[in-house]
Amino acid sequence: MATGQKLMRAIRVFEFGGPEVLKLQSDVVVPVPQSHQVLIKVHACGVNPVETYIRSGAYSRKPALPYTPGSDVAGIIESVGDKVSAFKKGDRVFCYSTVSGGYAEFALAADDTIYPLPETLNFRQGAALGIPYFTACRALFHSARARAGESVLVHGASGGVGLATCQIARAHGLKVLGTAGSEEGKKLVLQNGAHEVFNHKEANYIDKIKMSVGDKDKGVDVIIEMLANENLSNDLKLLSHGGRVVVVGCRGPIEINPRDTMAKETSIIGVSLSSSTKEEFQQFAGLLQAGIEKGWVKPVIGSEYPLEKAAQAHEDIIHGSGKTGKMILLL
């Protein structure tokens, strides 16, 4: 190591596998920002299910080893590259993507992936903005083309993306239905924009949703699906004519009957936030900024972990039951 290099604590992954491959190291060199990059002193970093898929080696995208996970960072800019003009040292920011990984005391990010963090939100909330809210925006407006007056079922609404979807959909004039797996989760979903909420652990909850919609032939216009490998077949039976299921999360295969899409001419659409253009990200950020100013963007924080408990966070985000709010690491 060259003399004068600063060191930091960071989670490093040297091999793909279970949560135990997340290793805390205290001698990781603090990266230096290049021309269009900033170095962020991380105060909080969101934990997302996709990070567990990448860590396991089962995801389509495999980072070069070793690597540091983490995208949803909130913190204070420590330094900027020589071509960065929109940000400066000391600015409070959040981002939806990092160059060097967010499970660390410092993280590099490209200057077109970071946004000012308003003083009205703390760093915990900032770490819950990027991927959850941008994914919700893309799912609702890019993938589903949702419109005011339509109905939307958020299937798995008590997590970070689900609650963000409820808030955004309610603010844009949709009738919002949600599901959760606990009484606490149901209450939280109602507090964050849903008109009605159902317990997806009850055997007859699908029938209750159908009754709520009213006309059995009408159905739900849009379903934002967080666990397609369990719910997609039922989703297709809940849709209205021309209805759309947007798949945000899936942990395995599922058998469906394509005939369920034919009579009502329904669609199944996948969503990938990383497919968004820079212009689309700017649109999402503008929508969030307006929501923050008007008060309907209210990130809900769930479980909090110190950096050294990252492996436990990965275990809990997949196997924990009745998750509510956004899971974060605190630094």
From Swiss-Prot:
Gene Ontology BP term (one): protein homotetramerization
Record PTM N6-succinyllysine, positions in chain: K298
Catalytic activity: 2 a quinone + NADPH + H(+) = 2 a 1,4-benzosemiquinone + NADP(+)
Binding residues for NADP(+): 53, 158-161, 181, 200, 231, 248-251, 271-273
Primary location recorded for the protein, binned into one broad class: cytoplasm
Keyword Acetylation in annotation: yes
Residues that bear N-acetylalanine: A2
Keywords attached to this entry: Acetylation, Cytoplasm, NADP, Oxidoreductase, Phosphoprotein, RNA-binding
UniProt GO MF annotations: identical protein binding; mRNA 3'-UTR binding; NADP binding; NADPH binding; NADPH:quinone reductase activity; zinc ion binding
Taxonomy, superkingdom: Eukaryota
N6-acetyllysine modified-residue sites: K23, K186
EC numbers, comma separated: 1.6.5.5
Top-level class of the enzyme under EC nomenclature: oxidoreductase
Protein's cellular compartments: Cytoplasm
GO CC term, one of those recorded: cytosol
InterPro entries: ADH-like_C, ADH-like_N, GroES-like_sf, NAD(P)-bd_dom_sf, PKS_ER, Quin_OxRdtase/zeta-crystal_CS, Zinc-ADH_QOR/CCCR
Signal peptide: none
SMART domains xrefs: PKS_ER (SM00829)
Modified residues (Phosphoserine): S35
Function: Does not have alcohol dehydrogenase activity. Binds NADP and acts through a one-electron transfer process. Orthoquinones, such as 1,2-naphthoquinone or 9,10-phenanthrenequinone, are the best substrates (in vitro). May act in the detoxification of xenobiotics. Interacts with (AU)-rich elements (ARE) in the 3'-UTR of target mRNA species and enhances their stability. NADPH binding interferes with mRNA binding.
Recorded family membership: Belongs to the zinc-containing alcohol dehydrogenase family. Quinone oxidoreductase subfamily.
Complex formation: Homotetramer.
Protein name: Quinone oxidoreductase
